[in-house]
């Protein structure tokens, strides 16, 4: 977590603002710093000057004299998140404030002479603390005025907060309107007073301006007090104390326990017990002595100042890190270059934060052998450059205004070069007599010649001793406890850091001796001496010189002669006062802008509140509708449940009826499936019978054809028998006279006729023609001689074909018969394929066994039996005519097969089932 510091305020005062880099921008930081500075106003005023409010209280207005109730206090002292009502708007405050002070502001901003010269009286100067009453802070109702800077006014003696008296805005004037009486902030410091107020009231910081989480800002003046953020909650024993008791009490002083070494390590240091120590009281004396020579312009010797007034930390030769820095006086104007232009109005009069690297933290071990811890630089170098100071990486566009001084803790063995500035050891810096006239002259010459009039001094860090564990717990549990100091000079301070397991910030500080009360007494004595010196100088000097001479006389033990360095110092102080006047004017303009911005933020906040109220009302309406809808749905659900419970019995009865119907339908379905199986079996049987019917029809057709052939054969035989009878009759008539050669031949041929008649015997018996049997030998014995004669005569006239031709006719007839049977079976197979049925392949393979009819087999047997006998002309003609009929039938069957195959192929392509595995006929 990085720290950013911004310093602003009047002379001897500054506002230390530490922000977190992860929370908010620099502009918001500066805005909160301005609000915090201008908002810490107190209602306490001096009794003898009721109509002259101090600087910074011009905007304080009490609309009611009634103190806030404890309930209001408890609400105000919360965590800073609860808004509180305001009595009047910020825009009205700004209008009243600037209407009363516009003329003074314009005249003061154009003048180069200092106007804010504070005169010191016996009761308000650097005297005792008797003029400060016991402070009990009462919270104002205005949040902007609740945290006004206390460094801008001095409490009046005997003033009590319990008085409800408050002046109006018209009766109040700024403190510099009356040039005859102005005031210097008295000791103790404002930080100490703030701590005292916090111990007496838990509601010191307003929750609007003080935010422990985002921005932490405190007001401090020239003192040895450490800048830190405190917890608003204080223990009971710190309540209701007077200021002197608070200053003398050991509670205010920092405790040293066993945890100091751990705290130093957490802060980034390496503590050792042998580190040279700078006591707070002795440091005050040394700084006061040196200030008379360097004109109050203190800078750490290892810092680099560029013409823009920026600060650049030099690298340590020992550890390569940077020592912590504490800003103790207001600095000159400069602006960071990388910020946007519209941010410069908030930042041009404030010191930007230090760009200090985290890894460049200095070590306290480098202080062991330090021989030149305190060195004064005259600001010049042999080659014309300002010693070891190099320009920073900050802005270079803002003019230089050298205001205020800084003190930086250094941990290098030798901070400056030996040829650039005189060196002083730790022992030498204890006495002012060790600083001789040559050193003074060198400082005067350095102020005249260098471009920056600021000279530097480095202060050694304080050694840390262990704290007791119980004291560490007390610090973590209780409020912040710091050490106060008197005087207007600043002593070195350390960087704030966060203690573990605690939300408050503590500082590493030097150990406190047991003679803390003696130190307070010494400081009070010193203040009284300074007061007497101030009274002596005020009688014969101007108001401006009176203030500076009082500081000078405090350093030189009452010396009344003004040297050249003192004149230069007075001139510089005049310039500083003029710069402060310009800063006041700028801050007033910034305040107006801040009030305008606050008013604008209030308007935006009101708008957001209205929108949120509207959204909440709409959400409430939506919620109401949603609740009503849910209630309606619940009612419907209850009704549905009731209806379901009442209708369970009816539904159960219907369910049983449906189950019975389903069971019956399943039984009917099973019966239908059984019937379908039977029908499919019958259909298969029908298809088989159908195929057998076709076969039987084909066989019947063949038998009919054979029957017709037999009939024709019978008719031919009858004609031949008639012819033979006729011939026999003729022979008998011609041969009636006796034996002739023809009769002898008939006797010889009688042995051959049975063989001729043999082929017809079976046919005649089959047809039942018993009358057509050949003539008996007994009946024809009388004609033998005449018949033989006729046979001899007719044998010479008979026309038979050759035996080879007869065999060819018989073979051709047999092949035609087989082809005819094959074609018939193939036709039946193709017909079944066309109908989508499985073909009977076994029938095709067994054509000869299944297809050949009995008549055809008998014909084959007859032809084989008569194969040796040649055909006659008439028999040959009959056989050829039969063969022609068979060939015609064969051609007809082949044409039918061709047509069926064509139809089957087209049907297969149309159905996309051309690749199915079926019986293909080659």
UniProtKB/Swiss-Prot annotation:
Bias type Basic and acidic residues, positions: 43-54, 70-94, 256-276, 468-484
Coiled coil: 564-728
Any single Gene Ontology cellular-component annotation: apical plasma membrane
Compositionally biased spans, kind Low complexity: 99-113, 539-563
Biased composition (Polar residues): 1-10
GO biological process: cytoplasmic microtubule organization; germ cell development; nematode larval development
Known role: Plays a role in the assembly of microtubule arrays in the germline acting redundantly with ptrn-1 to control circumferential microtubule assembly along the body which is necessary for larval development, viability, and morphology and integrity of the epidermis. Required for microtubule stability and anchorage by binding to microtubule minus ends. Recruited to hemidesomosomes in early embryonic elongation to direct the nucleation and growth of non-centrosomal microtubules.
Localization of this protein: Cytoplasm, Cytoskeleton; Apical cell membrane; Cell junction, Hemidesmosome; Cell junction, Adherens junction
Protein name (Swiss-Prot/TrEMBL): Non-centrosomal microtubule array protein 1
Region annotation (Disordered) ranges: 1-134, 250-277, 465-491, 533-563
Alphabetically ordered keywords of this record: Cell junction, Cell membrane, Coiled coil, Cytoplasm, Cytoskeleton, Membrane
């Amino acid at each position: 977590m990085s720290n950013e510091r911004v310093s602003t305020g009047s002379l001897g005062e500054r506002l230390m603002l530490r922000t977190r880099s992860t929370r908010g921008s620099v502009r918001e930081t500066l805005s909160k710093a301005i609000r915090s500075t201008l908002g810490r106003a107190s209602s306490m005023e001096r009794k003898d000057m009721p109509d002259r409010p101090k600087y910074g209280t011009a905007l304080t207005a009490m609309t009611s004299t009634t103190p806030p109730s404890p309930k209001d206090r408890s609400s105000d002292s919360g965590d800073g998140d609860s808004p509180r009502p305001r009595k009047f708007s910020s825009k009205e405050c700004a209008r009243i404030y600037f209407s009363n002070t516009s003329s003074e502001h314009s005249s003061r901003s154009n003048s180069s002479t200092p106007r804010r010269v504070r005169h010191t009286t016996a009761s308000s100067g650097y005297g005792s603390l008797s003029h400060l009453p016991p402070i009990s802070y009462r919270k104002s109702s205005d949040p902007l005025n609740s945290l006004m800077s206390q460094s801008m006014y001095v409490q009046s003696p005997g003033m009590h907060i319990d008085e409800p008296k408050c002046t109006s805005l018209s009766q109040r004037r700024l403190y510099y309107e009356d040039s005859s009486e102005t005031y210097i902030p008295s000791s103790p410091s404002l930080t100490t007073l703030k701590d005292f107020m916090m111990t007496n009231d838990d509601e010191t910081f307003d929750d609007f301006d003080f935010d422990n989480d985002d921005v932490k800002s405190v007001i401090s003046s020239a003192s040895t007090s450490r800048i830190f953020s405190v917890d608003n909650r204080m223990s009971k024993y710190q309540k209701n104390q007077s200021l002197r008791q608070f200053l003398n009490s050991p509670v205010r002083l920092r405790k040293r326990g066993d945890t100091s070494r751990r705290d130093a390590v957490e802060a980034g240091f390496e503590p050792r017990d042998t580190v040279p120590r700078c006591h707070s009281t002795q440091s005050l004396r040394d700084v006061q002595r040196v200030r008379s020579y360097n004109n109050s312009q203190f800078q750490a010797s290892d810092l680099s100042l560029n013409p823009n007034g920026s600060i650049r930390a030099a690298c340590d030769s020992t550890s390569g890190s940077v020592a912590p820095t504490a800003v103790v006086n207001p600095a000159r104007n400069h602006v960071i270059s990388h910020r946007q232009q519209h941010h410069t109005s908030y930042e041009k009069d404030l010191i930007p934060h230090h760009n200090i690297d985290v890894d460049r933290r200095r070590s306290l071990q480098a202080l062991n052998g330090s021989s030149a811890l305190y060195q004064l630089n005259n600001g010049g170098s042999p080659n014309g450059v300002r010693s070891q100071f190099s320009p920073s990486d900050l802005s270079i566009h803002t003019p230089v205004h050298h205001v205020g001084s800084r003190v930086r803790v250094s941990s290098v063995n030798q901070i400056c070069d030996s040829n650039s500035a005189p060196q002083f050891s730790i022992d030498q810096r204890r006495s002012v007599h060790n600083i001789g006239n040559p050193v003074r002259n060198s400082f005067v010459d350095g102020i005249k010649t260098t471009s920056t009039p600021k000279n530097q001094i480095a202060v050694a860090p304080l050694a840390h001793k262990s704290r007791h564990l119980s004291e560490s717990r007390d610090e973590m549990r209780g409020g912040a406890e710091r050490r106060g100091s008197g005087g207007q000079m600043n002593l070195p301070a350390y960087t704030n850091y966060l203690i573990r397991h605690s939300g408050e910030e503590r500082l590493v500080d030097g150990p406190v001796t047991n003679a803390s009360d003696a130190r307070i007494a010494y400081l009070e004595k010193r203040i009284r001496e300074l007061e007497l010196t101030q009274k002596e100088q005020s009688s014969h000097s101007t108001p401006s010189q009176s203030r500076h001479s009082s500081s000078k006389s405090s350093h030189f033990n009452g010396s009344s002669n003004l040297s050249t360095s003192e004149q230069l110092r007075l001139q510089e102080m005049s310039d500083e006062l003029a710069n402060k006047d310009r800063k006041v004017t700028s801050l007033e303009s910034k305040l107006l802008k801040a009030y305008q911005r606050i008013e604008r933020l209030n308007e935006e906040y009101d708008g957001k509140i209205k929108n949120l109220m509207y959204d909440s009302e709409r959400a409430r309406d939506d919620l109401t509708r949603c609740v009503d809808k849910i209630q309606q749905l619940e009612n419907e659900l209850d009704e549905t449940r009731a209806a379901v419970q009442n209708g369970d019995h009816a539904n159960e009865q219907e369910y049983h009826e449906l189950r019975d119907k389903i069971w019956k339908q399943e039984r009917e379905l099973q019966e239908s499936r059984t019937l379908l199986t039977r029908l499919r079996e019958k259909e298969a049987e029908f298809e088989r019978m159908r195929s057998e019917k076709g076969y039987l029809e084909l066989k019947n057709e063949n038998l009919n054809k054979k029957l017709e052939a037999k009939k024709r054969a019978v008719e031919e035989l009858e004609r031949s028998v008639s012819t033979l009878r006729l011939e026999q009759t003729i022979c008998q008539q011609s041969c009636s006279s006796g034996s002739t050669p023809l009769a002898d031949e008939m006797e010889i041929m009688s042995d051959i006729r049975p063989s001729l008649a043999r082929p017809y015997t079976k046919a005649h018996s089959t047809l039942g023609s018993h009358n057509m049997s050949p003539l008996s030998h007994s009946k024809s014995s009388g004609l033998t001689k005449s018949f033989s004669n006729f046979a001899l005569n007719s044998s010479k006239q008979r026309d038979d074909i050759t035996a080879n031709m007869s065999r060819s006719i018989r073979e051709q007839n047999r092949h035609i018969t087989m082809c005819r049977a094959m074609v018939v079976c193939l036709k039946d197979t193709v017909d079944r394929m066309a109908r989508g049925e499985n073909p009977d392949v076994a029938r095709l393979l067994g054509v000869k066994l299944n297809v050949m009819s009995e008549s055809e087999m008998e014909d084959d047997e007859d032809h084989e039996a008569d194969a040796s006998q040649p055909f006659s002309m008439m028999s040959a003609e009959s056989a050829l005519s039969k063969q022609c009929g068979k060939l015609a039938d064969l051609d007809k069957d082949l044409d039918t097969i061709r047509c069926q195959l064509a139809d089957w192929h087209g049907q297969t392509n149309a159905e996309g089932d051309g690749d199915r595995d079926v019986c293909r006929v080659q």
